[in-house]
């Protein structure tokens, strides 16, 4: 099974349980690091901070279900956490949600001589995002984005 399909299947299995426990699933990823596999789920609660106890509640519920369903054939570690203040932006839904906020975008390759941009997310369009940086609007094609993060406000 392809990784993208596995992640989609895992999201379909996990999202209802996360929701049942009173949280929203922000993002899910299945990665291999140093010869170990990790299933990482990032949860949130609108207008509330996520505590260690929140992560524990969701982790236990997911662990029980994943043991029964057994969707992952490899040995792996389950990690549940908050996306954090400087959360990664993965989808149009994430970008749209944070219009008007400060973001940092790293590029896959140079864009107008720049490797990245930090500024206010102004708009999200089908193939690009628009970031205002130092009074200029910079159009960033989505296929040029390597990473995008919200710049946290404390």
Curated annotation (Swiss-Prot):
| Any one GO CC term of the record | cytosol
Q: Which Gene3D superfamilies match?
A: Ribosome maturation factor RimP, C-terminal domain (2.30.30.180), RimP-like superfamily, N-terminal (3.30.300.70)
Q: Where in the cell is it found?
A: Cytoplasm
Instruction: Name the InterPro entries for this protein.
Output: Ribosome_maturation_RimP, RimP_C, RimP_C_sf, RimP_N, RimP_N_sf
State where it is primarily located: cytoplasm
For this chain's UniProt record, which GO biological process terms are given? Answer: ribosomal small subunit assembly; translation
Keywords of this protein's UniProt record, alphabetized?
Cytoplasm, Ribosome biogenesis
The superkingdom of the source organism is: Bacteria
Residue runs in coiled coils: none
CDD domains named among the record's database cross-references: YlxS_C
What is known about what this protein does?
Required for maturation of 30S ribosomal subunits.
Q: Which HAMAP family match?
A: RimP
Q: Which NCBIfam families match?
A: PRK00092.3-1
UniProt similarity note: Belongs to the RimP family.
Protein's UniProt name = Ribosome maturation factor RimP
Species, as recorded: Clostridium perfringens (strain SM101 / Type A)
């Amino acid at each position: 099974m392809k990784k993208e399909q596995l992640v989609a299947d895992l999201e379909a299995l996990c999202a209802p349980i996360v929701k049942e426990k009173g949280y929203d699933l922000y993002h899910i990823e299945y990665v291999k690091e140093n010869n170990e596999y990790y299933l990482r789920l990032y949860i949130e609660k609108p207008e509330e901070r996520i505590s260690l106890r929140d992560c524990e509640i969701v982790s236990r519920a997911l662990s029980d279900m994943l043991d029964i369903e057994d969707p992952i054939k490899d040995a792996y570690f389950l990690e549940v956490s908050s996306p954090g203040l400087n959360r990664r932006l993965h989808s149009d839904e994430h970008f749209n949600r944070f219009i008007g906020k400060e973001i940092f975008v790293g590029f896959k390759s140079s864009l107008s001589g720049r490797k990245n941009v930090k500024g206010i997310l102004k708009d999200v369009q089908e193939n690009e995002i628009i970031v205002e940086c130092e009074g200029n609007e910079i159009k960033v094609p989505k296929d040029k984005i390597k990473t995008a993060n919200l710049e946290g406000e404390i």
